[in-house]
Amino acid sequence: MRTFLLAALLLAPAASLSAQTFDPEARLKELGITLPTPDKPVANYVKAVRTGNLVFLAGHGPCGDFNRPDIQGRVPSQKSIEQGYEIAKLTAICLLSSLKQEIGDLKKVKRVVKVFGMVLSDQGFDRQPSVINGASDLFVKVFGERGKHARSAVGMYALPFNITTEIEMIVEVE
C-alpha cells in the first residue's frame, strides 16, 4: 500500500505538469505556423461533425484556392515525393484549422485517432505513405504522443480539383 501511495504522489506532479505544458497552439507558433481561416465547404456538407467525444473531419485539401498549380498534380510524374510531403503538411494545417473552429481550443485534443490520406498517384506508384508522412509528422510535432494515430495512405486515380492530397481525420476531444 505504501509503495502505491508513494508512486501516486511521485507521478501526480508529472501528470499535472504535462497537462500544463500541453499547448498545441504555442507549438504551432514555435513551428512558424499560423492557422488560416477554414474554407467554406464546396458542396452540401460540413467540414467537421462532433458526436460525443469524437470529431470527424471531412476530406480536406490545402486551404485556399484549389486551382493553384503548387498544390495540384500526380505523384511522382508531376510532383515529387518531397513536394507531396509538403502538400500533405499544408493539408494537415487546414485540418487543424477546421478542428480548432469546431472545438475552440486545440488543448481539448486527447488523441488524433485515425488519419485517412489520399494521394493523387500515377499508376504503379506505391509510396503514398511517404507523402502522407507530411501530415502525420506535423500532428506528432504539434500534439506529441497524442498526435500518434492509426493511418491509411492510399493512391487515387482522381481527386477533386486535381489536388495532390486529400486527408480525413478522426480526433478524440475532451
Specify the residue positions occupied by each region the protein language model found.
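Short, polar/acidic, helix-capping and beta-turn segments at strand->helix junctions
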Residues: 19-174
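Sec-dependent N-terminal signal peptides
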Residues: 4-13
